[in-house]
């Protein structure tokens, strides 16, 4: 006998146009809007953190608002360039070599968080040195707000019907337009919840309740560990990229491989921050 859960599990995902609206030749897409909204909300939240002197050691924020505003463009460049280059290198090098023009077609999707993290980290290092900003404190401010962008990015992935999960019969499983006739885990929403909402709340608790910004590098380490743990967990429900597949057995994915060193770096950053604080 068919149950409500079974009927829910075979509901097709409504095919949503990736283009929200057009203005002449300009097409506004969900993917691009997610990046813009995520960056702007993250910038707004970062300004509030920097303005709150009580969160900082000796009441001195890592940077002033003018410097933070200037960094916005650097951050956007690091995210987009690093994310795209990372995706090409980690996930789609063969296809790009066959059709090099695909490398610049960002509007069709294809961004790597790990690549974006590397790009943004390089942007922060250069910007901090140019402006005499304590690098670990700048890392901490950015780390505290990154989950906002992750949340909106994963919601855009869901709307676009991309990066879907593995086959599933859970009541909330979804039949995606490009995922075949079978229901799948909405793994984009799992990531939006864990990497976005949950991680944002955890970091906010450390920032506001534990005053973690007074220990440079601690928030960064917590973010990196939290993201790595969330990503590795969700990878068990997410379908691997078709052009790569599983790296070993039917479980090891590129996302897991890239997240393991992240977790180790996060643990090191936390240990380093605590050691430096104890020695101060």
Swiss-Prot record:
UniProt entry tagged with the keyword Protein biosynthesis: no
InterPro entries in the record: Lgt
The species this protein was found in: Sinorhizobium medicae (strain WSM419)
PROSITE patterns: LGT
Location(s) in or outside the cell: Cell inner membrane
Gene name, Swiss-Prot/TrEMBL: lgt
Function: Catalyzes the transfer of the diacylglyceryl group from phosphatidylglycerol to the sulfhydryl group of the N-terminal cysteine of a prolipoprotein, the first step in the formation of mature lipoproteins.
Membrane-topology annotation of the record: Multi-pass membrane protein
Residue positions binding a 1,2-diacyl-sn-glycero-3-phospho-(1'-sn-glycerol): 154
TM region(s), chain numbering: 30-50, 71-91, 106-126, 132-152, 188-208, 217-237, 251-271
GO biological process, one term: lipoprotein biosynthetic process
Name assigned to this protein: Phosphatidylglycerol--prolipoprotein diacylglyceryl transferase
Coarse class of the protein's main subcellular location: membrane
Keywords linked to the UniProt accession: Cell inner membrane, Cell membrane, Membrane, Transferase, Transmembrane, Transmembrane helix
Molecular function via GO: phosphatidylglycerol-prolipoprotein diacylglyceryl transferase activity
Pathway(s) the chain acts in: Protein modification; lipoprotein biosynthesis (diacylglyceryl transfer)
GO cellular component, one term: plasma membrane
Catalytic activity, EC: 2.5.1.145
EC top class, as a word: transferase
């Amino acid at each position: 006998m068919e149950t409500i859960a079974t009927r829910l599990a075979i509901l097709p995902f409504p095919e949503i146009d990736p283009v929200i609206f057009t203005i002449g030749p300009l097409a506004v897409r969900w993917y691009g809007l997610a990046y813009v909204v995520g960056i702007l909300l993250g910038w707004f939240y970062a300004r509030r953190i920097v303005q709150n002197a009580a969160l900082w050691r000796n009441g001195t924020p890592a940077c002033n608002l003018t410097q933070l505003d200037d960094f916005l463009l650097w951050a956007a460049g690091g995210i987009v360039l690093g994310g795209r280059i990372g995706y090409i290198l980690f996930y789609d090098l063969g296809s790009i070599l066959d059709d090099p023009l695909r490398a610049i077609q960002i509007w069709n999707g294809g961004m790597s968080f790990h690549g974006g993290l590397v790009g943004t980290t390089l942007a922060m290092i250069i910007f901090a040195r140019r402006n005499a900003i304590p690098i670990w404190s700048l890392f901490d401010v950015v780390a505290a707000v990154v989950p906002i962008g992750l949340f909106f990015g994963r919601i855009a992935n869901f709307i676009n019907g991309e990066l879907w999960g593995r086959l599933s019969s859970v009541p909330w499983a979804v039949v995606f337009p490009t995922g075949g006739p079978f229901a799948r885990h909405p793994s984009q929403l799992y990531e939006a919840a864990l990497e976005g909402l949950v991680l944002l709340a955890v970091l906010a608790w450390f920032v506001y309740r534990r005053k973690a910004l007074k220990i440079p590098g601690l928030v960064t380490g917590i973010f990196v560990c939290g993201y790595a743990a969330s990503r590795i967990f969700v990878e068990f429900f997410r379908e691997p990229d078709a052009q790569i597949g599983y790296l070993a057995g039917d479980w090891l994915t590129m996302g897991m491989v890239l997240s393991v060193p992240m977790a180790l770096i996060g643990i090191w950053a936390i240990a380093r921050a605590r050691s430096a604080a104890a020695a101060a």
